[in-house]
């Protein structure tokens, strides 16, 4: 009878436990739904306020080449992104011309961005607890940095989503041992690998140590009930991931990059990369010194989260988060020895940083719990830290959505507005000259003009520019990084008598300066270079850009040795010259001379001291019957080789 009573009550007890669990879960899910809605509002807000920028246009133009070209004919920098990324962009282009509106092109990133907080909540629930998961999800939802990438038609927000989802599935594999979670882990990881190469080079290596630990536990428990089934599920999942990884590795080996040089690596560079990474993840976009102070505060609270996690014996959670932060910093430091790396590559580390931050905030309420009064003080401290963090994120959103301030958080020059303005003003007898750092405007303006500019358009360092006849007007398109009126005033004050600007059009991060009856092109370009030199400190453009421009002017005058000296002084802007030179050669082979010139000029700007670039430019000039300019390029190449 007793046995019967126990058996009767056991299902009832289980049902009661399940009901209690559901009752406890409901408020958390409602809060999570609210967080996702807030994130959606922020990511859809002002989605088309700015036109597509250089990287987005690059993705769009590769996608516009068609499915066959995406799968079989990528070359140069086109191979930096995966076919799946380009196919997704290709699909988004079908309903609407991206030069008319950027909404549909950016929509996939928006959707990935608003789903990420939900996955972050799951991560928090499986590591530190439900409250930490909700708080970290809220931080991701209102992070201006994450919002910025969610409004960018690039794959970085997908990398963050799929990495978080992969880790969540792995945690569920560890806790439940169910095959479905192994298959979900394989699917999420494969999607990550197919979407971006950074999943292969940065995210997967960060996950690998924890994955090995989980696999060890599965192997150790293989003789337990269901152990063999779990082992086979893990093995099949790893086989699928390995197959996708091998395919993507074979593809990435075609990217023209220089292998890392470990002789240039130092342990201090890991700390430097970690600091840069954390600064970017929590960035709010204020003045540099204030930003540094705020990020030290955020990092300090996250460190408190590490200490409290260890104190509460949450070793698994702390280890996982630290792996996801330290391993990418290490890999970035190694890659940086010979390549340019950018902090957007490690956006996927944000959820793990914010989990530590959330744990640090909630830990404060438990540090002081000896008496009731101390408990109240601890709760007040925790509330103050949480409120302070939300104020910081709110400040970041204000800066990001303020047209006059968002420049600190994202690079969104208004090429769309400048293209419309120039279409209305410039004509066949005019000349449009771009003076930028780096020279991205040629590609973006050409995109918005559908390949038909209103007037001949050249970058300021293009050697063809010096052979152009005297124009009626010159429209100077300049990078205006600081949007500081003092820079414009300095340019005007540096103008020689009789050569003031007839009109000035200001766009976000761009200036369009109209100069009437400028005379011959080369003297006009020299005057503009002198203006920029006089106005430079402490404004944009950088000295590197000015050295390259001055070198091109010396080259046009025939002083190739001085030109070579200036090119060497300029040094590299980014170590990406090979990618762009290879891309130029690819376009040249396919008969697209306009694109070949554009990529060659970008390569020249990035690494002007490389003889190979000048040799290639000499070839292009010779094909256009510009023999004097071709001879000068060849001589510069020889001078650079001699000095090297």
Describe the function of each predicted region:
Residues 196-198, 246, 386-515:
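Catalytic lumenal/periplasmic loop and adjoining terminal transmembrane helix
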């Amino acid at each position: 009878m007793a046995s019967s009573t126990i058996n009767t009550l056991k299902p009832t007890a289980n049902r009661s436990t399940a009901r209690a669990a559901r009752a406890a879960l409901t408020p958390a899910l409602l809060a999570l739904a609210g967080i996702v809605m807030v994130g959606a509002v922020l990511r859809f807000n002002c989605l088309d306020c700015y036109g597509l920028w250089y990287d987005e246009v690059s993705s769009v133009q590769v996608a516009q080449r068609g499915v066959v070209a995406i799968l079989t004919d990528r070359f140069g920098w086109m191979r930096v992104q995966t076919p799946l990324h380009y196919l997704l962009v290709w699909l988004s282009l079908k309903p609407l011309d991206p030069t008319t509106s950027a909404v549909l092109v950016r929509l996939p990133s928006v959707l990935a961005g608003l789903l990420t907080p939900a996955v972050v909540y799951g991560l928090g629930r499986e590591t530190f607890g439900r409250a930490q998961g909700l708080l970290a999800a809220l931080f991701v939802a209102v992070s201006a940095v994450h919002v910025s990438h969610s409004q960018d038609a690039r794959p970085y927000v997908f990398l963050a989503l799929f990495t978080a989802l992969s880790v969540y599935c792995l945690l569920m594999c560890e806790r439940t041992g169910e095959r479905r979670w192994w298959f979900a882990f394989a699917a999420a990881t494969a999607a990550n690998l197919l979407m971006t190469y950074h999943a292969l080079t940065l995210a997967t290596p960060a996950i690998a140590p924890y994955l090995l630990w989980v696999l060890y536990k599965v192997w150790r428990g293989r003789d337990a009930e269901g152990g063999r089934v779990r082992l086979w599920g893990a093995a099949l999942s790893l086989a699928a991931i390995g197959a996708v990884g091998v395919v993507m590795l074979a593809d990435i080996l075609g990217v023209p990059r220089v292998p890392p040089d470990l002789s240039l690596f130092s342990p201090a560079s890991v700390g430097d990369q970690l600091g840069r990474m954390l600064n970017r993840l929590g960035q709010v976009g204020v003045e540099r010194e204030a930003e540094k102070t705020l990020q030290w505060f955020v990092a300090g609270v996250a460190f408190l989260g590490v200490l409290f996690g260890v104190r509460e014996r949450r070793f698994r959670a702390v280890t996982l988060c630290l792996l996801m932060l330290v391993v990418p910093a290490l890999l970035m430091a190694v890659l940086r020895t010979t390549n340019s790396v950018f902090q957007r590559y490690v956006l996927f580390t944000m959820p793990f940083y914010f989990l530590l931050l959330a744990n640090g905030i909630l830990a404060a309420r438990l540090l002081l719990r000896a008496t009731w009064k101390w408990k109240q003080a601890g709760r007040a401290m925790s509330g103050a830290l949480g409120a302070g963090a939300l104020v910081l994120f709110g400040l970041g959103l204000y800066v990001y959505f303020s047209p006059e301030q968002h420049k600190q958080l994202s690079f969104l020059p208004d090429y769309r507005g400048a293209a419309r303005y120039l279409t209305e003003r410039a004509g066949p007898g005019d000349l449009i000259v771009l003076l930028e750092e780096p020279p991205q405007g040629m590609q973006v303006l050409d995109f918005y003009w559908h390949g038909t500019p209103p007037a001949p358009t050249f970058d300021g360092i293009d050697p063809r520019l010096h052979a152009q006849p005297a124009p009626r007007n010159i429209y100077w398109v300049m990078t205006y990084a600081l949007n500081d009126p003092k820079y414009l005033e300095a340019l005007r004050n540096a103008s020689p008598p009789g050569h003031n600007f007839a009109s000035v059009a200001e766009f976000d991060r761009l200036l369009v300066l109209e100069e009437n009856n400028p005379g011959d092109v080369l003297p006009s370009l020299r005057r503009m270079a002198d203006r920029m030199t006089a106005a430079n400190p402490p404004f944009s453009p950088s000295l590197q850009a000015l050295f390259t421009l001055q070198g091109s002017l010396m080259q046009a005058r025939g002083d190739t040795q001085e030109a070579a000296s200036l090119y060497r002084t300029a040094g590299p802007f980014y170590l990406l010259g090979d990618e762009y030179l290879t891309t130029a050669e690819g376009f040249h082979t396919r008969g697209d001379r306009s694109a070949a010139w554009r990529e060659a000029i970008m390569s020249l700007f990035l690494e002007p001291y490389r003889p190979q670039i000048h040799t290639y430019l000499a070839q292009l000039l010779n094909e256009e019957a510009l023999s004097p300019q071709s001879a000068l390029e060849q001589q510069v190449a020889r001078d650079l080789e001699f000095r090297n």
